[in-house]
Amino acid sequence: MSIILGIDPGSRVTGYGVIRQTGRHLEYLGSGAIRTQVEDLPTRLKRIYAGVTEIITQFQPNMFAIEQVFMAKNADSALKLGQARGTAIVAAVNNDLPVFEYAARLVKQTVVGIGSADKVQVQEMVTRILKLSDKPQADAADALAIAITHAHSIQHSLHIANSVKMTETQEKMTALLKTRYSRGRFRLKI
């Protein structure tokens, strides 16, 4: 069982979403947004850090997933986003959480099936995947989508690991059978 905290970073609004993954089953635990007022950047970063720390304390996640920085046209906006993202990561690391990063395009591809999906499509699919009665706010939906992407990544990794183990087992069994057959210890019955 994993409890995954997904974060959609922003210097004014940072979305969060928390899900529990048990095998292939995903359960919604909570979501929302950390909103900062029109204040100086250091104060906003302090609020983001405190907010993420509070969410970690409340939900006790054991994994932290966050959106990677994308290239923005406005350098100032990109720097502020990077600082907000870094602040959230520090809150996770200070609480001993492993940090996983996902590109926005991969998140949309995983949740919607289209890497160029818009926010409305992401909201709709998050609502369906988690069987929610109401659509979450856009920032919260993006954060939940990041958490879902991480859950999918875990499931995919387990599948690959099991496939590798199965392949190794099959190879060992084949080698054993070939050895026994070549030494006459094993006879094929047709």
Curated annotation (Swiss-Prot):
The record, for Gene3D superfamilies, names:
Ribonuclease H-like superfamily/Ribonuclease H
Q: Could you name the Gene Ontology cellular component terms for this entry? A: cytoplasm; Holliday junction resolvase complex
Is Transit peptide among the key words of this record? no
| Subcellular location(s) of the protein | Cytoplasm
Q: What does this protein do?
A: The RuvA-RuvB-RuvC complex processes Holliday junction (HJ) DNA during genetic recombination and DNA repair. Endonuclease that resolves HJ intermediates. Cleaves cruciform DNA by making single-stranded nicks across the HJ at symmetrical positions within the homologous arms, yielding a 5'-phosphate and a 3'-hydroxyl group; requires a central core of homology in the junction. The consensus cleavage sequence is 5'-(A/T)TT(C/G)-3'. Cleavage occurs on the 3'-side of the TT dinucleotide at the point of strand exchange.
What family does this chain come from, according to its entry?
Belongs to the RuvC family.
* Catalytic activity, reaction form: Endonucleolytic cleavage at a junction such as a reciprocal single-stranded crossover between two homologous DNA duplexes (Holliday junction)
> Which positions bind Mg(2+) 2?
67
Write out the catalytic residues in the record: 8, 67, 139
Matching entries from PANTHER family are given as: CROSSOVER JUNCTION ENDODEOXYRIBONUCLEASE RUVC (PTHR30194:SF3)
Q: Which cofactor does it need?
A: Mg(2+)
Query: What EC number(s) does its UniProt record assign?
Result: 3.1.21.10
Q: Which InterPro entries does the protein's record reference?
A: RNaseH-like_sf, RNaseH_sf, X-over_junc_endoDNase_Mg_BS, X-over_junc_endoDNase_RuvC
Q: How is the cofactor bound?
A: Binds 2 Mg(2+) ion per subunit.
Gene Ontology terms, MF aspect? crossover junction DNA endonuclease activity; DNA binding; magnesium ion binding
What are the entry keywords?
Cytoplasm, DNA damage, DNA recombination, DNA repair, DNA-binding, Endonuclease, Hydrolase, Magnesium, Metal-binding, Nuclease
Originating species: Haemophilus influenzae (strain 86-028NP)
Q: Quaternary arrangement and interactors, per the entry?
A: Homodimer which binds Holliday junction (HJ) DNA. The HJ becomes 2-fold symmetrical on binding to RuvC with unstacked arms; it has a different conformation from HJ DNA in complex with RuvA. In the full resolvosome a probable DNA-RuvA(4)-RuvB(12)-RuvC(2) complex forms which resolves the HJ.
Q: What superkingdom does the record give?
A: Bacteria
Entry's Gene Ontology BP terms: DNA recombination; DNA repair
Q: What is this protein called?
A: Crossover junction endodeoxyribonuclease RuvC
UniProt keyword Magnesium present: yes
Q: Which Pfam families match?
A: RuvC (PF02075)
Q: Where does Mg(2+) 1 bind?
A: 8, 139
